[in-house]
Amino acid sequence: EKGYKVAICEQTEDPKKAKGIVKRDVIRIVTPGTVLDTNILDEGRNNYIMCLFKNVDGFGVATCDVSTGEFVVTSFEDTAENKVMDEIAKYMPSEIICNDGIDFGDQIERVFGIKTATYNDWSFDYQNANICLCNHFKTLNLCGFGIDDDSRYGNDWLFLCFHRKLCG
């Protein structure tokens, strides 16, 4: 609820063989939108993580509940922030990640009480997104998923990379 990130660590060496402090590595980072523990999640409520991307063509929005696998992608051809705010209200995500182009993070936090985590625009590069998604889904292109718009790729790619980084 507070928006914290929690690092999960494990010992990586046998304490009997260690000289001094036992070596530990971070194996996973849990954020509000990547919680999978049913004891922590509210029963009957989805736990969405949302990714927002803005460029000159408009907005891309990717929403996922990692506990159920639900994944929805949409885009808006104009730059009307109210449509994005409607998407946020519709899903009420636990966490929002976005690119530098999203300049209304303070408004999102004020209206919905959800903090945004901002990533550099290069994290949303179209070519990287296309390659990453095709590799992930083991396809030559993404037309079979109904994804053929550049603005959507950046969102999906960032979400997949973010999810891989946090959840392994």
What is the predicted role of each segment?
Residues 1-168:
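Basic, polar low-complexity surface loops/patches
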